[in-house]
Amino acid sequence: MSTGSTFKAIGKKVLSSCEMPLYSREVQSQIACQVNWIDDCLRSSRRQLSALDDLVKSQFVEMFGDGEWTSKTIGELATDIRYGTSKKATECGKYTYLRMNNLTDDGKLAYDDVKYIDLSGDELEKCQVVDGDLLFNRTNSREKVGKTAVFHGDTSMVIAGYIIRVRLGEEMRSDYLSVFMNLSTTKAMLRSIAKGAVHQANINSKELAAIKVPVAPIELQDRFLDFVARVDKLGFDCCREIVCCGVLFSSMSASLLCT
């Protein structure tokens, strides 16, 4: 239906010729009520999801933000800090290739848009991620630079050059550090130390290694992460409700248009 060589467009004539079911006003009112109900459910679930994220961060500040704990740099806590590979991704390959778009703004890993790559030997060892590795997005826009998430899983994956892999020693859990890195205060600090232009800001491995983190006892870190796990379960329920709302809306739309 669309035309045009530079960009696709639908003309007025084509649009005017489109047919659609014409329901009575009463039925239209019922449909509007159903759509509004789905929209309300969707908005509510998204608000709950955002509130749960805020809850985790506020709990972190409450437990560890009073200055009681000795601080150490990430460099002192890490056993290895390493850049990813600069090799180009492909549509096929042995290993999933994690890029900066796979790290979300809220500290998660998203796998809905991945590339692949083939590596071997020393290069694979340097760039491969294992369960518990902390991933840090070193180059991005100034607003997004410093995105941080933890890799969990046993599937072999490789990181791109815009990501720094951090492996921690026994003093700190990577998920604890990830929550710290995703605090609004930490993100503001990351923006302040990032070098470069607005659309291409950078934080190198030395600058990352110099960041100080409160080092609470492992037992207390684990207690906090137990709390995070319970909140994550609630978050999973919210995500499931969001998906269900989307499916319900699509199903209802298809049913109405096919009538």
Where does each model-flagged region fall?
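A generic structural signal for short beta-strands and their flanking turns/coil linkers
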Residues: 94, 113, 160-162
